[in-house]
């Protein structure tokens, strides 16, 4: 017990010392909340949402304020140095929650784009990386009628999209680990800015409403990289298949059609277990998916007794999941031969001898890989 306490004390001292190691006063630091990277005229354009007491109010009334500052240079380093010259402050990335990579940066080497952040002393390893359709600057500077959208709100939108199966999380530490694998592959969510019509109250003294377009963030695709380069995008269904086959679905929402009646499915709990085995020169991955789900809707419109209805809905759910998984593995393994399914990790752990013998011809391994999927579904009907 004394040893444990001693270790904790030393660890605490190290944390305190590391926190105090810099000599820069907080007033001299530019506290960055969001970063965006674009390529313009063969130059890097870096956009930052920076905490600023005298800046523009964020969307939550009474909340913090921020400025959006940009810098350009022939490297990310020099673009950030320009931001420091403009602000007169040292950029601090320790509070940064999101890194947007613009569409113009999509064809750049992903490892090179992230190098500055991986080498920075204070960058949070859980930093979320997101590709954008359009300019990253537009996302960093996105405004509502009440001001700039805060990093916390954007992070919350991403979390909800991940939960709903629309996005796959890509955090800095994980992406860096991914691109150190044989194929240098990784998958990163893609975000769009879309406009929706929304009824808003004209003023507080009137019940009259008017329709106005509101900008919202939406996730529906996933960028796939191979050899550190962007190669293709997965759609929403393929993204969900990717999440099933990498045990990233914990809960999700979807809908199915049962005899012409729409039924909402809430997956409250899910787990995927994967075990590879070798048959000749082929890899078969035994895949067991266990889910607890709830079905809701106008189920009385379906002319089935409870037992038949439960069986019918279960089969619909299973078929939907299998379709998503098969679609994903076909496009990734057969067409693009890109391992963002963590197959290398599975082989290295469970079939190490085979992995060592075959890694020099890894694309052939992927072509000869298949999944044997079984699904167990516990269902409640409301």
Describe the residue ranges of each PLM region:
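Membrane-proximal alpha-helical signals and transmembrane carboxylates
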Residues: 3-9, 13, 17-382
């Amino acid at each position: 017990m004394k040893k444990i306490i001693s270790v904790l004390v030393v660890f605490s001292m190290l944390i305190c010392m590391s926190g105090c190691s810099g000599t820069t006063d907080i007033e001299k630091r530019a506290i960055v909340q969001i970063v965006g990277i674009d390529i313009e005229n063969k130059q890097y354009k870096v956009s930052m949402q920076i905490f600023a007491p005298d800046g523009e109010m964020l969307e939550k009334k009474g909340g913090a304020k921020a400025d959006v500052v940009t810098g350009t240079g022939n490297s990310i380093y020099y673009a950030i140095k320009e931001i420091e010259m403009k602000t007169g402050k040292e950029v601090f990335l320790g509070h940064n929650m999101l890194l947007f990579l613009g569409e113009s940066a999509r064809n750049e080497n992903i490892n090179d784009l992230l190098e500055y952040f991986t080498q920075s002393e204070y960058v949070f390893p859980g930093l979320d990386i997101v590709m954008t359709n359009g300019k990253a600057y537009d996302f960093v500077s996105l405004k509502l009628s009440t001001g700039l959208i805060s990093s916390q709100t954007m992070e919350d939108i991403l979390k909800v999209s991940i939960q709903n199966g629309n996005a796959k999380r890509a955090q800095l530490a994980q992406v860096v680990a991914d691109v150190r694998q044989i194929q240098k592959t990784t998958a990163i969510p893609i975000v769009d800015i879309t406009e929706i019509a929304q009824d808003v109250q004209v003023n507080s003294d009137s019940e009259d409403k008017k329709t106005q377009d509101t900008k919202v963030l939406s996730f529906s695709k996933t960028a796939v990289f191979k050899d550190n380069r962007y190669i293709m995008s997965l759609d929403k269904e393929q993204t969900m298949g990717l999440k099933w086959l990498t045990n990233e679905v914990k809960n999700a929402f979807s809908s199915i059609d049962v005899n012409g009646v729409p039924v909402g499915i809430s997956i409250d709990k899910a787990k995927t277990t994967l075990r590879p085995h070798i048959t000749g020169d082929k890899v078969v991955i035994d895949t067991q998916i266990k889910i607890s789900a709830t079905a809701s809707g106008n189920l009385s419109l379906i002319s089935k007794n409870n037992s038949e209805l439960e069986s019918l809905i279960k089969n619909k759910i299973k078929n939907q999941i299998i379709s998503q998984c098969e679609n994903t593995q076909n496009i990734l393994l057969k067409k693009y031969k890109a391992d963002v399914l963590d197959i290398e990790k599975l082989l290295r752990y469970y079939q190490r001898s085979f992995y060592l013998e075959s890694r020099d011809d890894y694309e052939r391994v992927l072509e000869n890989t298949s999944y044997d999927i079984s699904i167990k579904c516990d269902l409640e009907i409301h």
